[in-house]
């Protein structure tokens, strides 16, 4: 369960619903693991914040289609990172404790 300060712009339930939807979309696209990072993971997101997601197992030919689907279904900007190709970025985020596994 993610925890957010009360003064943040969004409703915690709405964000958690979007994260569940994102995880389901990504799992249906073949992802084996889905991670949240960035301001949403740290709990300091603002009204203009996006959702930063990293995945393992997404077939490269589905990357852009899946990214497009995420942004349309969530109705917000999504940064999607393929951790299969960005392993050093994954390791750095993991080392500093900024990853939250959501799927």
Language model regions located:
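Periplasmic OmpA-like peptidoglycan-binding domain that tethers envelope proteins to the cell wall
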Residues: 49-51
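Short hydrophobic/aromatic beta-strand micro-patches
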Residues: 54-56
